[in-house]
Regions:
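N-terminal leader/targeting and accessory segments in enzymes
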Residues: 1-83
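Phosphate-binding loop of NTP-binding sites
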Residues: 80-202
Length: 202
């Protein structure tokens, strides 16, 4: 990821990555994301006051009140977070067979069918989608069809550590647009269909 070191040192140690300012604490890197409703660059100073080690920004902010924080500027903080998260968790998606299913309709049904077939063939499958996360008898709910990149990479690591050899996921158009799947190298891609539901203006 091309970047500019605005201040501080590239040798700054980071223990974890956050994009929710409420989780700010010493030793963390806070990625400032421009969302649809809020721009988390607004919370950079608050996070610095709480002791975060690194700020990742995509547009200039006033740094006068945070001289001790390492600040890195990138073109897209969402894209940067996706690659940073992959590196943080050891790029687990590269150590499993990755299958992505995208399209306007049919993603959930298709992923469940693929999961059933693969498991019948003896594969250990972790699945992420509209109905949540499934792996080896575990299930947990998700807020989005395609979770944020940090949660995705963390989940892939959980799959791998649990013994999964295959990761199967629904890839939403929003997930693609918002760089949630950036840095993931899919072995197999499945395209179901395209309808006006997913064709926006322009």
């Amino acid at each position: 990821v091309p970047f500019t070191l605005v201040q501080g040192s590239l040798d700054t140690e980071v223990q974890d990555i956050i994009y929710d300012s409420r989780k700010a604490a010493p030793g963390l890197a806070f990625v400032c994301i421009v969302g649809t409703q809020r721009d988390s660059h607004e919370f950079a100073a608050d996070c610095a006051a709480k002791g975060v080690s690194v700020l990742v920004i995509q547009h200039d902010i006033d740094l006068s009140a945070m001289p001790g924080v390492t600040v890195v500027k990138v073109e897209s903080s969402r894209y940067a977070m996706a690659l940073m998260s992959g590196n943080l968790f050891g790029n687990p998606s590269r150590q499993m067979t990755m299958i992505g299913v995208t399209g306007t309709k049919g993603k959930t049904t298709t992923t469940h069918m693929i999961k059933s077939v693969l498991e019948a063939a003896g594969r250990k499958v972790g699945m992420i989608g509209t109905n949540g996360i499934y792996f080896l008898g575990h299930h947990q709910e998700t807020a989005n069809t395609t979770p944020e990149s940090y949660e995705l990479q963390k989940t892939f690591r959980e799959f791998l550590d649990a013994g999964c050899d295959t990761a199967l996921m629904e890839v939403s158009s929003q997930g693609i647009m918002m760089d949630r799947v950036a840095g993931i190298h899919y072995d197999i891609g499945v395209f179901t269909n395209l309808s006006p539901d997913h064709i926006g203006p322009g």
